[in-house]
């Protein structure tokens, strides 16, 4: 950013450039001019160039051109920099959400999954260690390197932490129960098929656990993975247990994304085969 732009921005907050300061001398064009103080020439501290003495705004401009801002050191110590997302009007205008700054040393970091990011695989997502920002969508090659190797395991088995898997399954069951337990005449047929007074029927809960094993990896693919999976279950249940169409604009948008079409198809096929065989298909998938 040029010095002229900076001086103009600073002068905009004070009086206009070119108005005289005290003592009849030209005022500074920048912040000093805004306060109405006399230019450096009035006090005899102008800048000499070519044997002459430049006063007022000319002296300030000469000093500005010759000044070099000292380099700021990054935060030391074991904790290092603490980054926060830059939230400004220009970032919002251009949709920039990957710019971070350390408030202490003013060091900037572009968190876009590039070489400066320290990427950590948390099991649920790919996260930059410096900012905590999820960068999985920006480092496709890196993700493929880690995910494609165990693609079959991720599609057919729960996460490494089985307790986490069960917790996710229970959360989905509660949300599915809440969704279909509403006072909606169009959902009455489905409520009778999948709900009891206190929750989902046991066989429905078991089907959710079995089919979740082929969709659990979506959590590492999308920032809204949980919502996508819940939407998948809503569509699967409606398509199987309803004899009439009850879709609306608020339901299930993930079929518009081809990446999830194959996952949805596998979930529905596994749901149907497990329901028909009494769990044999689910046991085979778990193996």
From Swiss-Prot:
Compositional bias (Gly residues): 20-58
Disulfide-linked positions: none
Pfam family, one: Herpes_UL92
InterPro entries, per database record: Herpes_UL92
Residue span of region Disordered: 13-58
Domain of life: Viruses
Family per record: Belongs to the herpesviridae UL92 family.
Protein name: Gene 31 protein
Species of provenance: Equine herpesvirus 2 (strain 86/87) (EHV-2)
